[in-house]
Structure formats: structure tokens, C-alpha cells
């Protein structure tokens, strides 16, 4: 019987962890990055590496920034070469994975779910009175 869920291999998880740590370090240092990222606090929420280890999907969440999501995405993409070089020096693999940045919608979705639950509770309270 086939598994319904796909699990990441140990190599995928280890590489994702190393990339996550390297991203945090280079973003903290700020060297070689697009200048728009200097005053833009970012959290790398997760890194998912494909099974062939060729692509690393990196999810981010900006905090307290005047930049739009697209501006942050463009700044990260402009810094991609420097980020990839930095990561290449941190990992020991034949080929460095292509880094792809994605906005993490998880926080926004959690807020929406919380609002929906509050609305349901308010409606339930109105029906009970």
C-alpha cells in the first residue's frame, strides 16, 4: 500500500536546515545584499528542498517594513547570486541548489481563520440569546 503523504529524505531535511541557517546568517550580516534589505527585518519561515536537491524553495515573512511584498521579493531575487554563493560555501554538495523565494501566506491564513472563528462565536452567541 502506498503512503498518502510524501516525506522528505534525510538529505533533503539536512540541506534545508543548512540553507535556512545560511540564509539567516547572510540576512543578518547584510553584506552583498540589495540595499532595500538593510532595514527590512525578515524571517525565513521554512526551506523545502526538492527530491533531486536542485531547488530550494525558501519562504519568508517580512516584519515592520515599508516595502511591499513584491519589493522584498525583488530585493531578495536581486541578491540571489550573492546568497547562492554564500550558501555554496556552507554546504558540501556537488551542485548548489537554485534558490527560489516565496512569500509565506501561513501567517495571513492563520489571521483569517482566527477572524472566521470569532465571527462564528459571535453568531453563536447571538443565536443563544
Swiss-Prot record:
Single Gene Ontology MF annotation: ribosomal small subunit binding
Leader sequence residues: none
GO BP, sorted A to Z: maturation of SSU-rRNA
Keywords: Cytoplasm, Ribosome biogenesis
Cited PROSITE patterns: RBFA (PS01319)
Compartment list: Cytoplasm
Pfam families: RBFA
Main subcellular location of this protein, as a coarse class: cytoplasm
GO cellular component: cytosol
Assembly notes: Monomer. Binds 30S ribosomal subunits, but not 50S ribosomal subunits or 70S ribosomes.
Purpose: One of several proteins that assist in the late maturation steps of the functional core of the 30S ribosomal subunit. Associates with free 30S ribosomal subunits (but not with 30S subunits that are part of 70S ribosomes or polysomes). Required for efficient processing of 16S rRNA. May interact with the 5'-terminal helix region of 16S rRNA.
Family membership: Belongs to the RbfA family.
Alphabetized HAMAP family for the sequence: RbfA
The name this protein goes by in its record: Ribosome-binding factor A
Taxonomic source organism: Rickettsia akari (strain Hartford)
